[in-house]
């Protein structure tokens, strides 16, 4: 498994399990919102009023509505990841 997959899969899985609302920005600038229902190597199923299959190669950014904690694998540290920040958080 590549390093990219070893972060991507636990991140998406945590968002799915915890049913965290997400904003997904596509490479063409379109913003999609919903909850991650499922995912595989190539696609993400995003559920809102309808389910949408979004190809990963079209995704630029996944922004969770709140932080999620990733499970520790092979002794790695657990780090909160994601969430939105206010403009005055700097």
UniProtKB/Swiss-Prot annotation:
Alphabetized UniProt keyword annotations:
RNA-binding, Stress response
* Residue ranges annotated for the Sm domain, each copy included: 9-68
A GO BP term here is: regulation of DNA-templated transcription
- Signal peptide positions are none
Q: Which GO terms describe its cellular component?
A: cytosol
Oligomeric state and interaction partners are given as: Homohexamer.
Which family does the record claim for this protein? Belongs to the Hfq family.
User: What protein name does the entry list?
Assistant: RNA-binding protein Hfq
Specify the species. Answer: Nitrosococcus oceani (strain ATCC 19707 / BCRC 17464 / JCM 30415 / NCIMB 11848 / C-107)
User: What gene name is given for the protein in this entry?
Assistant: hfq
């Amino acid at each position: 498994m590549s390093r990219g997959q070893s972060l991507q899969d636990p991140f998406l899985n945590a968002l799915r399990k915890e049913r965290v609302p997400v904003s997904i920005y596509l490479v063409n600038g379109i913003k999609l919102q919903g909850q991650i229902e499922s995912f595989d190597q190539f696609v993400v199923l995003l559920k809102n009023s309808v389910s949408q299959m979004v190809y990963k190669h079209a995704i630029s950014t996944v922004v969770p509505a709140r932080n999620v904690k990733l499970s520790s694998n092979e002794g790695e540290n657990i780090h909160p990841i994601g969430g939105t920040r206010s403009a005055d958080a700097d």
